[in-house]
Amino acid sequence: MDTATADPTVTGAGAGRPGGRRRFGAGCAALLFAGVSVVVGCRAADTDAITPVPQLLAFLPWLLVPTAAGLLFTLLARWWTGAVWGVVLLGLLAWFIEPYGKAGDPVGPPVAELRVLTSNVQFGRAADALVDVVRREEPDLVFVQECEYTCDATLKRELTDAYPYRQSVAGGGSEGSVILSRFPLRGTAGVPGTMGMPGAVADVDGHTVRLQLAHPMPPLPEQVRLWQRELGRLRDAAAADRDTPTVLAGDFNATQDHAAFRRILDTGLRDAARLAGADRTPTWPSRTLPTLGAQIDHVLVSEHFAAHRTRVLPLPDTDHSAVLTNLTLHAAP
């Protein structure tokens, strides 16, 4: 009698525990997939949407991690519909991780070689480190962001002999920016923004090249619209003259996974890092997550240029790595 009454109780408890674990696993997977789906859906819809989507889009490749974790939960829970959901998300992420934009070599004859370096020196703190890198690497054009008054004075004192031509926007904190050049420069209006974005026209061995420094505001939660507007102004500047060779370089505070940045590429500009096979190399935050970060510093070039090598150079005293690329300018066919 005692044995007969005990058996159903033991059987019922044993059957309930696996079902609870499966429901828990399926719930965890659904939460992970739902979050990833929002970001991937915005990427597919070509929109940066609202916070927190722009911030998460910067790290889109790393969404593979929660997606893979969710897929593991679905397998443990034997939730096959969820497994299909996870596989679809993995496929979409793999598709979007591929390089965006045009590639290919120019068709005209080569006419000039030049090296371009861009660096965000974080409120001028890395000015001395930048001077060392510039002296070692000897770029022809240097785009410097967040170069406040002390930084500007340092660059004038240390680099004027090697870079006699400059175009700058003076400012404190993050507002100052400067373009240094071995080639003669003629200043242009630049692009209006909260932080300085000077522009110039360079005479590169007798060939006209448009130069524009990029430094739009970052997509902080309270200023996503401002970030989009300033990237839009850079897009308009890029589209204003597609026939003249152009270099647009700086801290864009955006990756290829942001719709506002892709619209700049859609004007015909190409990312030199992508052309040289380094399109996903992180540049920020270089001090805290150097291998898990995002590529937000770029050298964009028009179809007149070929990029042979692009390197990401860590600098002390700043949270951005510098980007150095070797370019060949080709004449129109």
Which residues make up each language-model segment?
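N-terminal, active-site-proximal structural segment of metallo-dependent hydrolase catalytic domains
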Residues: 2-157, 331-333
